[in-house]
Design a protein with these regions (language model features):
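Short hydrophobic/aromatic beta-strand element in the GNAT-like acyltransferase core
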Residues: 32, 74, 111, 124
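Glycine-biased flexible loop/turn sites that connect beta-strands or occur in inter-domain linkers
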Residues: 35, 118-119
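PAS (Per-ARNT-Sim) sensory domains
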Residues: 123-124, 143
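Residue-level recognition of short loop/turn positions
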Residues: 80, 117-118
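Regulatory sensory and allosteric helical modules in signal-transduction proteins
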Residues: 38-44, 54-107
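Intrinsically disordered, low-complexity terminal regulatory regions
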Residues: 1-70, 138-140, 144-149, 153-160
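A short, aliphatic-rich beta-strand micro-motif
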Residues: 108-116
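Short beta-strand-to-loop transition segments that serve as allosteric relay/switch motifs
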Residues: 124-133
Length: 160
Protein backbone atom coordinates (compact mmCIF):
# COMPACT_ATOMS: atom_id res chain seq x y z
CA UNK A 1 0.00 0.00 0.00
CA UNK A 2 1.39 3.35 -1.05
CA UNK A 3 0.49 5.20 2.15
CA UNK A 4 2.35 2.68 4.32
CA UNK A 5 5.40 3.11 2.10
CA UNK A 6 5.19 6.92 2.39
CA UNK A 7 5.16 6.57 6.17
CA UNK A 8 8.00 4.04 6.18
CA UNK A 9 5.76 1.39 7.73
CA UNK A 10 4.88 -2.19 6.98
CA UNK A 11 8.20 -3.68 5.90
CA UNK A 12 10.45 -3.79 8.95
CA UNK A 13 10.12 -4.33 12.67
CA UNK A 14 10.30 -1.05 14.56
CA UNK A 15 11.51 -1.02 18.18
CA UNK A 16 9.17 1.90 18.91
CA UNK A 17 6.22 -0.13 17.67
CA UNK A 18 7.37 -3.17 19.64
CA UNK A 19 7.46 -0.97 22.74
CA UNK A 20 3.99 0.37 21.94
CA UNK A 21 2.71 -3.21 21.54
CA UNK A 22 4.26 -4.10 24.91
CA UNK A 23 2.42 -1.19 26.52
CA UNK A 24 -0.84 -2.27 24.85
CA UNK A 25 -0.32 -5.75 26.29
CA UNK A 26 0.37 -4.30 29.74
CA UNK A 27 -2.65 -1.96 29.68
CA UNK A 28 -5.05 -4.67 28.50
CA UNK A 29 -3.34 -7.48 30.43
CA UNK A 30 -3.28 -9.49 27.21
CA UNK A 31 -0.51 -12.01 26.54
CA UNK A 32 -0.17 -11.05 22.88
CA UNK A 33 -0.38 -7.53 21.43
CA UNK A 34 0.38 -6.33 17.92
CA UNK A 35 0.57 -3.36 15.62
CA UNK A 36 -0.46 -4.94 12.35
CA UNK A 37 -0.14 -3.27 8.95
CA UNK A 38 -2.45 -4.65 6.27
CA UNK A 39 -1.28 -4.69 2.67
CA UNK A 40 -2.82 -6.03 -0.54
CA UNK A 41 -1.71 -9.63 -0.06
CA UNK A 42 -0.19 -9.79 3.40
CA UNK A 43 -0.16 -8.56 6.97
CA UNK A 44 3.00 -7.38 8.68
CA UNK A 45 3.45 -7.14 12.45
CA UNK A 46 5.36 -3.87 12.71
CA UNK A 47 5.03 -4.06 16.48
CA UNK A 48 4.84 -7.27 18.49
CA UNK A 49 4.65 -8.18 22.16
CA UNK A 50 4.43 -11.81 23.28
CA UNK A 51 4.23 -12.14 27.06
CA UNK A 52 5.73 -14.91 29.13
CA UNK A 53 2.65 -17.13 28.95
CA UNK A 54 2.84 -17.50 25.16
CA UNK A 55 4.06 -21.03 24.28
CA UNK A 56 7.26 -21.50 22.28
CA UNK A 57 5.56 -22.85 19.13
CA UNK A 58 3.30 -19.79 19.01
CA UNK A 59 6.32 -17.50 19.41
CA UNK A 60 8.06 -19.35 16.58
CA UNK A 61 5.01 -18.90 14.36
CA UNK A 62 5.08 -15.15 14.97
CA UNK A 63 8.82 -14.73 14.46
CA UNK A 64 8.59 -13.94 10.74
CA UNK A 65 5.96 -11.26 11.46
CA UNK A 66 4.33 -11.83 8.05
CA UNK A 67 1.00 -13.56 7.45
CA UNK A 68 -1.40 -14.09 4.61
CA UNK A 69 -4.20 -11.57 4.50
CA UNK A 70 -6.58 -14.54 4.89
CA UNK A 71 -5.30 -15.24 8.43
CA UNK A 72 -6.55 -13.51 11.52
CA UNK A 73 -9.14 -10.88 12.22
CA UNK A 74 -7.27 -7.64 11.51
CA UNK A 75 -8.19 -7.57 7.79
CA UNK A 76 -11.87 -7.55 8.83
CA UNK A 77 -11.21 -4.57 11.10
CA UNK A 78 -9.52 -2.68 8.26
CA UNK A 79 -12.29 -3.43 5.75
CA UNK A 80 -15.04 -2.49 8.24
CA UNK A 81 -13.04 0.47 9.60
CA UNK A 82 -14.48 -0.36 13.03
CA UNK A 83 -13.18 -2.00 16.17
CA UNK A 84 -13.91 -5.71 16.58
CA UNK A 85 -14.50 -7.50 19.88
CA UNK A 86 -14.55 -11.31 19.95
CA UNK A 87 -14.76 -12.59 23.51
CA UNK A 88 -14.62 -16.16 22.21
CA UNK A 89 -13.95 -16.60 18.50
CA UNK A 90 -15.59 -20.03 18.65
CA UNK A 91 -18.93 -18.34 19.32
CA UNK A 92 -18.83 -16.79 15.83
CA UNK A 93 -18.99 -19.29 12.94
CA UNK A 94 -17.59 -16.67 10.56
CA UNK A 95 -14.44 -16.35 12.67
CA UNK A 96 -14.13 -19.78 14.33
CA UNK A 97 -12.75 -21.40 11.17
CA UNK A 98 -9.95 -18.89 10.74
CA UNK A 99 -6.50 -20.53 10.43
CA UNK A 100 -5.18 -18.67 13.50
CA UNK A 101 -7.58 -20.63 15.70
CA UNK A 102 -5.88 -23.92 14.80
CA UNK A 103 -2.35 -22.70 14.04
CA UNK A 104 -1.85 -20.30 16.94
CA UNK A 105 -4.68 -21.20 19.28
CA UNK A 106 -6.27 -17.75 19.43
CA UNK A 107 -9.56 -17.79 21.32
CA UNK A 108 -10.28 -14.08 21.87
CA UNK A 109 -9.53 -10.92 19.90
CA UNK A 110 -9.82 -7.19 20.42
CA UNK A 111 -8.68 -4.79 17.71
CA UNK A 112 -9.19 -1.26 16.41
CA UNK A 113 -8.26 0.28 13.05
CA UNK A 114 -5.42 2.73 12.52
CA UNK A 115 -7.01 5.35 10.29
CA UNK A 116 -4.60 8.11 9.37
CA UNK A 117 -5.29 11.76 8.59
CA UNK A 118 -5.73 10.99 4.87
CA UNK A 119 -8.52 8.52 5.66
CA UNK A 120 -6.47 5.42 4.87
CA UNK A 121 -6.87 2.41 7.16
CA UNK A 122 -3.22 1.45 7.66
CA UNK A 123 -3.81 -1.57 9.87
CA UNK A 124 -4.74 -2.27 13.47
CA UNK A 125 -3.73 -2.27 17.07
CA UNK A 126 -4.91 -5.55 18.52
CA UNK A 127 -4.61 -7.96 21.41
CA UNK A 128 -5.41 -11.64 21.57
CA UNK A 129 -5.62 -14.30 24.20
CA UNK A 130 -5.37 -18.06 23.99
CA UNK A 131 -8.44 -18.35 26.22
CA UNK A 132 -11.91 -16.81 25.96
CA UNK A 133 -11.94 -13.36 27.49
CA UNK A 134 -14.75 -10.90 28.25
CA UNK A 135 -13.26 -7.63 26.95
CA UNK A 136 -16.48 -5.66 27.47
CA UNK A 137 -17.00 -1.97 26.81
CA UNK A 138 -13.90 -0.98 28.83
CA UNK A 139 -11.74 -3.14 26.56
CA UNK A 140 -13.34 -1.66 23.46
CA UNK A 141 -12.82 1.92 24.65
CA UNK A 142 -9.24 1.15 25.67
CA UNK A 143 -8.23 -0.37 22.32
CA UNK A 144 -9.85 2.51 20.42
CA UNK A 145 -7.99 5.06 22.54
CA UNK A 146 -4.70 3.21 22.03
CA UNK A 147 -5.26 3.14 18.27
CA UNK A 148 -5.90 6.90 18.25
CA UNK A 149 -2.75 7.43 20.31
CA UNK A 150 -0.65 5.44 17.86
CA UNK A 151 -2.07 7.29 14.85
CA UNK A 152 -1.08 10.57 16.55
CA UNK A 153 2.45 9.21 17.07
CA UNK A 154 2.67 8.17 13.42
CA UNK A 155 1.58 11.64 12.31
CA UNK A 156 4.13 13.27 14.64
CA UNK A 157 6.90 11.11 13.14
CA UNK A 158 5.74 11.97 9.63
CA UNK A 159 6.30 15.66 10.35
CA UNK A 160 9.92 15.10 11.45
Amino acid sequence: MRRLHELGLGDDADPRLDEFARRVGDVTRAPLAMVNFIQAERQYLGGLYAGGTIPGPVRAGLAGRTFSRAHGYCPHVVVRRKALVLDDVCDYPRFAGNPVVDEIGIRSYLGAPLIDRTGVALGTVCVVDLEPRPWGRPGLETIKALAAELVAQIHAREGN
